[in-house]
Amino acid sequence: MLQLARFYSLARTKAIHSHGAPFRPEYALKCGLEIHTQLNTKNKLFSQSTNSATSLVDAPNHHTSYYDIALPGTQPVLNLEAILFAMKLSLALGSQVNSISQFDRKHYFYGDQPQGYQLTQHYRPFARGGKINLSKELDDIDESAKEIGILQLQIEQDTGKSHYTETDKDVITLVDLNRSNVPLIELVTKPDFSDIKQVRAFIKKYQNLVRHLHISSGDLETGAMRVDVNLSINEYARVELKNLPNTSSIINAIKYEYQRQVELISVGDTSSLMEPETRGWTGSSTVKLRSKETTIDYRYMPDPELPYINLAQDVISGVRGLMPQLPDDIMRMLMKKPYQLSLKDAKILTYNSNQNDMYNHEALRSYYLDTFREFSKLAGERSNAKLPTNWIIHEFLGDLNKLQIPLARAKEILPPPVFAQFLKLLHEEVISATSGKMLLFHILENFKQSNCQDLSIPDFSKLIEKFELHAINQVDPQELMDLCNDVIAQHTDDTFIRNLVTGKKKSSLKFLIGQGMRRSQGRIKANEFEKKFKEILNIQW
């Protein structure tokens, strides 16, 4: 890779400070990443074939054109959507998009590369520079702030897949070219990582960025994102690690390779560390694949069939003006007034894991923000910022997941203004939290039972009256006394009561309050139960 060896020889070594990692300050790690990301374009990079590289259901070689299988006489036609996606990622990373870039042929022979070469950008990459900033506040690293520099981004085409089948006499290789010519972006970082936490945080942040920009699924498990690691210790030669299918493999491979090299250095056996080499990860150890002596000469040359990519500055500026707000900025906004979300809740509204079919982070964030604004109008200055957070992110989402109702459908009966009215009932203590949970679940359950066809907006007043969910403002003292005594009578264990009264197990009081709330169907407030239980049991703490 261009400039990579020079950066590894010049980068300043740093001491390792990683909790739980087997790193020692006297053996300083320098680490960089090469990340290949498949782009979610409609078509492939140089043909009109459908881009379905990560599909697990398509028949082999179903999405291929004459060009994808390298039929003689076919020529590449550049997919401009891939250029747009590359521009969006480059701008999000703060990279310098080159006004002129070009494609080069990287020559090698392998069964899943029918052309005999791969089209990449060796001499004039698409973009250079840029960075991703990590912080203790948002990314759980040990340093207060850490900048990971980007060397370059380049566009290239993916290869096909080889499948191996063993027979009694031989090993048969089957080639699937559905993935051949799928557009990739290769991102190369500087060797700025000095511990495991930084690597893990970077991968997670980069995954979320490409999902946030809608340019890739970012999934390691499907091969939509593939990561190679470059590392060295104490200025010895760089080792490249390959075959890393997921984040845990990446982390474990770095740990193993670090320990392997430390053991060699500590006993003075450093001859094998003097020259760069490539090693593969088996799942439990790294094994040598090739050394400098066996490195392939790719014989790079400019592709004569493709013109330069020439981007005018007004095109770059136009795309910059269409860029969405970036995840870190969104999270910091959500964690400040008026929203005041916790980091965990802010990430739920910002990070897209691709693992939840009920909602995506953008739709959920939009619903939350719209509801928050509507609730603030209704409640005025007395509005409680935590109420929309708790009820949307925790209760509402929990019900949607339990009932398997997509957010897009639930919004039809509970649009933000209606959900804000529901929050107002809780805010003004017309209903208790327990009654609110029952009411919300009842509304969604009925909607589910209608196969999401009954789009009637719920009438909260009628439902509250029907199910007698009104909070009791004037509690009958005798009724409350009887309820509390009944709850206490269910616990004949003297140790339970004694530990509660002495304060040895204060949490037991919350348990009793919960029992009372259930018996009253949430109509009697928790603080009423707390006062009465303390009175009956003579609790002094």
UniProtKB/Swiss-Prot annotation:
It comes from the Eukaryota. It is an enzyme of class 6 (ligase). One of its GO terms (cellular component) is glutamyl-tRNA(Gln) amidotransferase complex. It is found in: Mitochondrion. Disulfide bonds: none annotated. Allows the formation of correctly charged Gln-tRNA(Gln) through the transamidation of misacylated Glu-tRNA(Gln) in the mitochondria. The reaction takes place in the presence of glutamine and ATP through an activated gamma-phospho-Glu-tRNA(Gln). This is Glutamyl-tRNA(Gln) amidotransferase subunit B, mitochondrial. It comes from Saccharomyces cerevisiae (strain RM11-1a) (Baker's yeast).
